[in-house]
Amino acid sequence: MLVARTCQLYPNAIASTLVHKFFLVFSKWEWPNPVLLKQPEECNLNLPVWDPRVNPSDRYHLMPIITPAYPQQNSTYNVSVSTRAVMVEEFKQGLAITDEILLVKAEWSKLFDAPNFFQKYKHYILLLASAPTEKQRLEWVGLVESKIRILVGSLEKNEFITLAHVNPQSFPSPSENSEKEEFRTMWVIGLVFKKMENSENLSVDLTYDIQSFTDTVYRQAINSKMFETEIKIAAMHVKRKQLHQLLPSHVLPKKKKHSVEGVKLVSLNDSSIDLSVDSDNSMSVPSPTNATRTSPLNSTGLSQGNSPATPVSLSVTNTQATDVMVPQNNSTENSGGSLNESIPETATHPAFSSTPRPLVTRVVSSMPLVNQVQKPVTNTVTKMPSPVAGVKRTSSPTNEESPKKTKTEEDENDSSNSTEVDEQNKLEPEELKEVHSEEKSSSPVPGALPSSQRSSSTDLSDISVLPATPIPVIKNSIKLRLNR
């Protein structure tokens, strides 16, 4: 319909000119003015038609493209803020490319280059639908796919998210259990986080967004008598450099292999997901947090390993600082004289401004957990790489923190449970630090605070230490911490 409207505006133009005018017109279209091929007809057949003067809900459509035949309907009913932003950006990109083509600076083949979706964003949400049989998978995938727009709308309401871009293509997903046959389908959603000024640590809680989506899908499955205990939805957060572990090889461009840990898809119905986002090159592995014990002096958000019988939560941080914000790729403005080209005036309905919806704020404290005390730990403490130097913490839960823990960022990550180990770690090589840390891990913690002064960690986005007494952890949680 957009092409037909372009042909109406330029009835005598040749094909190459129409392509250029197509991108010119709709890259500058003032949405939500509707695109109409003809004025709506009035018939007394009592069928619902798109008319914002009569239907208040039609006034909130963001990108109305109206079908010409009666009853007229909005063909882009499912367009969201993010979807419209992606399409407008592509219109501008197409305009820039066609400008180059008309100036003989590029070939027409450039207009058909594959998109760079899997290189465009730094953070992604993976949705996975699984079923025991192929027939059930087809039904289950159809239901989940029809509800993804609800998840996108929920993510857009998060005050820290600027864009949620869904890849329209679904992908097969490898099965976790080789002994049990499963049929799995996966969708990928790219995220752009808002750049916050005067904030070094940004905590984003996606628990409510993901949970409301899964509840809606399961409720619909129950109402349609499709629900069975073996059909599931899994959701997780991954970074760009982890995608090659989960997607087919032909989807991603070939590049150097990265040495990273394996990523495990965790069902939302099984455990909570606690993720720490420190840099583009870091990697977060979701794991259950119900029985995890870590070193009490670990105050940088790095969960250290313990005995093999206990689930391990890892967060590996590289030593180079990178900004985790992904600015949206702004398309190059049209070159040449396209700005001076006139667009024929057409009669359109006045723009119906969308009433802003109430913003649901879900702020999770970004204050790092420091000096959390528990009983002396006798388990093996695994040495982890030091995080980015110079990353500041906003505040500390208590005022009695030992000053030895804040000398440098490197001392903070390499410290063990005693002052003597801190002094010796500076002189020992990397391999000896790990062994020495294991020998000293059973020593009592200096400067321990009484239990009455311990801070509650239930509101922290990156829980690195659990108290001695287990606390209730909300299930189905996906929390991110972005360090500026």
Curated annotation (Swiss-Prot):
Region (Disordered): 276-314, 326-356, 375-484
TM regions (residue ranges): none
Statement: the UniProt record of this protein carries the keyword Ribonucleoprotein: no
A GO term, aspect molecular function: poly(A) RNA polymerase activity
One cellular component (GO) term of this entry: nucleus
Keyword Nucleus: yes
E.C. code: 2.7.7.19
Catalytic activity: RNA(n) + ATP = RNA(n)-3'-adenine ribonucleotide + diphosphate
GO terms classed as biological process: mRNA processing; RNA 3'-end processing
Keywords of this entry: ATP-binding, mRNA processing, Nucleotide-binding, Nucleus, RNA-binding, Transferase
Short motif Nuclear localization signal 2, span: 392-407
Low complexity bias (residue ranges): 451-464
Motif interval(s): Nuclear localization signal 1: 240-257
Cellular localisation: Nucleus
Compositionally biased intervals (Basic and acidic residues): 423-441
Function: Polymerase that creates the 3'-poly(A) tail of mRNA's. May acquire specificity through interaction with a cleavage and polyadenylation factor (CPSF).
Family (UniProt): Belongs to the poly(A) polymerase family.
Assembly and binders: Monomer.
Protein name (database record): Poly(A) polymerase alpha-B
Organism name: Xenopus laevis
Lineage: Eukaryota, Metazoa, Chordata, Craniata, Vertebrata
Gene expressing this chain: papola-b
